[in-house]
From Swiss-Prot:
<keyword id="KW-0456">Lyase</keyword>
<keyword id="KW-0460">Magnesium</keyword>
<dbReference type="GO" id="GO:0000287">
    <property type="term" value="F:magnesium ion binding"/>
</dbReference>
<dbReference type="GO" id="GO:0006099">
    <property type="term" value="P:tricarboxylic acid cycle"/>
</dbReference>
<comment type="subunit">
    <text>Homotetramer.</text>
</comment>
<keyword id="KW-0120">Carbon dioxide fixation</keyword>
<protein>
    <recommendedName>
        <fullName>Phosphoenolpyruvate carboxylase</fullName>
        <ecNumber>4.1.1.31</ecNumber>
    </recommendedName>
</protein>
<dbReference type="InterPro" id="IPR007566">
    <property type="entry name" value="PEP_COase_arc-type"/>
</dbReference>
<dbReference type="GO" id="GO:0006107">
    <property type="term" value="P:oxaloacetate metabolic process"/>
</dbReference>
<comment type="function">
    <text>Catalyzes the irreversible beta-carboxylation of phosphoenolpyruvate (PEP) to form oxaloacetate (OAA), a four-carbon dicarboxylic acid source for the tricarboxylic acid cycle.</text>
</comment>
<dbReference type="GO" id="GO:0015977">
    <property type="term" value="P:carbon fixation"/>
</dbReference>
<dbReference type="Pfam" id="PF14010">
    <property type="entry name" value="PEPcase_2"/>
</dbReference>
<dbReference type="InterPro" id="IPR015813">
    <property type="entry name" value="Pyrv/PenolPyrv_kinase-like_dom"/>
</dbReference>
<dbReference type="GO" id="GO:0008964">
    <property type="term" value="F:phosphoenolpyruvate carboxylase activity"/>
</dbReference>
<comment type="similarity">
    <text>Belongs to the PEPCase type 2 family.</text>
</comment>
Length: 532
């Protein structure tokens, strides 16, 4: 890969996601950064303010812990910070986080005047180029303020943005978002000499489905490389995913597979479940292997491939949402039972926030110029738009909830989608999806089937939704030749939980989960290799 900045690009990024069964307090995270970068071999660590109760001083604590451990941040090991979204949370929280980064760099410079420190921040939930340019403007403002009022050197405020794009409509529109950002920066006299682009794999699956998330991420990676050539700006994709297939299937022992599946990715996240819910030696060896594997060329997509991809995304999404809209109220209740393993903002309340509701019509708009099938899908998806839903859970808790009731989310909409693609687009399109666009489909679905117990799901969730997933399962077995589940120990835990799940759902939720049930939920997470 072409060199895109003064320092090299990290291959592995350790994050603070709450997808492990181990609880990590915010006070422990500075030591965790040292463990990740020194002991586990990850090349980058992300301090996370987005949706999290991270203290203002954590960037300072992280940099100083690493300095004391002999790590020169910004050379061979790196720290980035995910700041809050000004639109989804508020401007004040974003500016506070930016000032925290600048103050951290200032403290590090006192110890090491040549240190680079933190020089990149992640902008979450990016939906427009204007958001990015406005955040750059806030960085400039915060930099001047910190210099004038806090005696922070201007050098400490040299921060670049990494846009995080994490919904299917935005991933399909990534070309316009990134082009608008680069051109907007040039209009205000600021050049973008390189750009790392964070592609979310987890949240688009929550809102739009497993297959739509996979396909949209593939297209986004391809478009990043195409735009890099067109705009003359070196770009490097980061793929943000977790251990379970619904969230990316980035797990120890599968390095060769996911590096090939998401070809072109420069940096892979190794989230908490990767590090804590697998054998430590295996996790270390896996991180080492990812670091060794060179970034390969992205999947090349022809015009026909892109058309198949967009239409298939719409078809799978339609079938996913037909279940999601029926079951999300009940799944929310189960999701609230999943233990918290980081100090997060609440989903509800004055300082909490929830994900936006799905917007199928926006995906449909991408189809309307793609022939008769595209126009029909556009009309179908417009009719599916809803104005109000219960507040959505986080993707990790949603995934954990689906596995807990015996209905892994990877199955939802997949089988019916495959059947409709064959019927409406033909065998060539079906073969493109299964063989070229998503080679790991069978392996990912076989993993999910090991935890599938739809009888239990049917006793907890609305029967109409579970019946659709049963049809999905039948088609998946037919198209992908899947084997029945063989993990009877896990099945016994699902059956043990079933009466309690029915009780909690009938009550509309509980204030406090039974400690025995909490232990069962954590044990189930350990068995599948991640809480959610």
């Amino acid at each position: 890969m072409e060199k895109v900045r003064e320092a090299r690009i990290a291959r592995t990024l350790a994050t603070q996601h709450p997808d492990a069964t181990k609880f990590v307090r915010v006070q422990e995270e500075p030591e965790e950064a040292v463990e990740c970068l020194v002991e586990l071999g990850a090349e980058e660590y992300m301090v996370d303010f987005e949706g999290k109760l991270t203290p203002y001083l954590q960037p300072i604590q992280v940099l100083m812990e690493l300095y004391d451990a002999g790590v020169r941040v910004g050379e061979e090991r790196f720290v980035i910070v995910r700041v809050p979204s000004a639109t989804k949370e508020n401007v004040l929280r974003q500016v506070q986080a930016l000032l925290g980064v600048m103050e951290a760099n200032s403290e590090l410079l006192k110890e090491d005047p040549d240190a680079r420190g933190i020089f990149e921040v992640v902008h979450p939930m990016t939906s427009s180029p204007e958001e990015l340019v406005e955040t750059v403007d806030r960085i400039s403002y915060a930099r001047r303020f910190a210099s004038r009022e806090l005696d922070v050197p201007l050098k400490a405020g040299n921060l670049r943005i990494i846009p995080l794009i994490e919904e299917v409509p935005e991933l399909l529109d990534i070309r316009n978002i990134l082009t608008g950002y680069v051109e907007g920066m040039r209009e205000i006299g600021m050049d973008v000499s390189y750009l790392r682009v964070f592609i979310g794999r987890s949240d688009p699956a929550l809102s739009y489905g497993h297959l739509p998330a996979v396909l949209a991420c593939k297209l986004a990676i391809f478009e990043v490389y195409e735009l890099s050539d067109e705009l003359g700006v070196p770009m490097a994709p980061i793929l943000g995913g977790g251990c379970l297939p619904f969230r990316g299937h980035i797990r120890p022992g599968m390095e060769e597979e996911f590096v090939e599946e998401y070809a072109g990715t420069a940096t892979y996240t190794v989230q908490s479940g990767f590090r804590y819910d697998h054998d430590r030696e295996k996790a270390v060896a896996s991180i080492r292997r990812i670091n060794e594997l060179a970034a390969n060329d992205p999947l090349q997509l022809s015009g026909d491939d892109i058309e198949y991809l967009v239409l298939a995304t719409a078809i799978f999404m339609k079938h996913y949402l037909s279940v999601f809209f029926r079951c999300i109220g009940t799944l929310n209740i189960v999701a609230d039972m999943i233990p918290n393993t980081r100090d997060r903002l609440a989903r509800k309340g004055p300082v909490g926030y929830a994900r936006d509701i799905p917007e199928p019509d926006r995906v449909g708009a991408q189809c309307k110029d793609l022939g008769d099938v595209g126009r029909e899908l556009y009309r179908e998806l417009r009719r599916m738009r809803v104005e109000k839903l219960p507040e959505l859970p986080r993707a990790i808790k949603f995934t954990g909830a689906c596995y807990t009731v015996g209905m892994p989310p990877e199955l939802i909409g997949t089988g019916r989608g495959l059947a409709e693609i064959e019927e409406r687009l033909g065998e060539d399109a079906l073969d493109a999806v299964i063989s070229r666009l998503y080679p790991m489909l069978r392996e990912d679905l076989q993993f999910a089937v090991e935890y599938t117990f739809l009888e239990t799901a049917g006793s907890v969730l609305p029967s109409s939704g579970v019946a659709m997933v049963n049809t999905d399962l039948e088609y998946c077995v037919e198209y992908l030749d899947l084997e029945p589940p063989s993990d009877f120990e896990y099945q016994n835990l699902v059956h043990t939980l079933e009466p309690y799940l029915r009780y909690v759902v009938s009550e509309g939720g509980v204030e406090e989960v039974n400690p025995f049930v909490r232990d069962l939920l954590l044990e189930m997470g350990r068995m599948r290799g991640s809480l959610g």
